[in-house]
């Protein structure tokens, strides 16, 4: 069972197609670096919808898998 996405991952998933459209030849490592930089530059107020979405995912995950323990 996968862990629920955090706020950054929710935001990153929503942006996935945009970066690929702009730079289809860019490597995943570079895309990840750019997403990380953009996330850090976002205002806290702009992050709120993604934080709330991540919290909803976390609560649903807890309900769906009550005995889940993260084991890397």
From Swiss-Prot:
Pfam families: HMG_box. GO terms for molecular function: DNA-binding transcription activator activity, RNA polymerase II-specific; RNA polymerase II cis-regulatory region sequence-specific DNA binding. Residues 1-69 bind DNA. One of its GO terms (cellular component) is nucleus. It is found in: Nucleus. SMART domains: HMG (SM00398). The keyword Transmembrane does not apply. Gene3D superfamilies: High mobility group box domain. GO terms for biological process: brain development; camera-type eye morphogenesis; negative regulation of transcription by RNA polymerase II; neuron differentiation. Keywords: DNA-binding, Nucleus. This is SRY-related protein AES6. It comes from Alligator mississippiensis (American alligator). The lineage of its organism: Eukaryota, Metazoa, Chordata, Craniata, Vertebrata.
């Amino acid at each position: 069972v996968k862990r629920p996405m955090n706020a950054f991952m929710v935001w990153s998933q929503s942006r996935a197609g945009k970066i690929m459209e702009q730079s289809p030849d860019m490597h995943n490592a570079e895309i990840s670096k750019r997403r990380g930089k953009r996330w850090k530059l976002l205002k806290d107020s702009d992050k709120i919808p993604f934080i709330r979405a991540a919290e909803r995912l976390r609560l649903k995950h807890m309900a769906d898998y009550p005995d889940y323990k993260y084991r890397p």
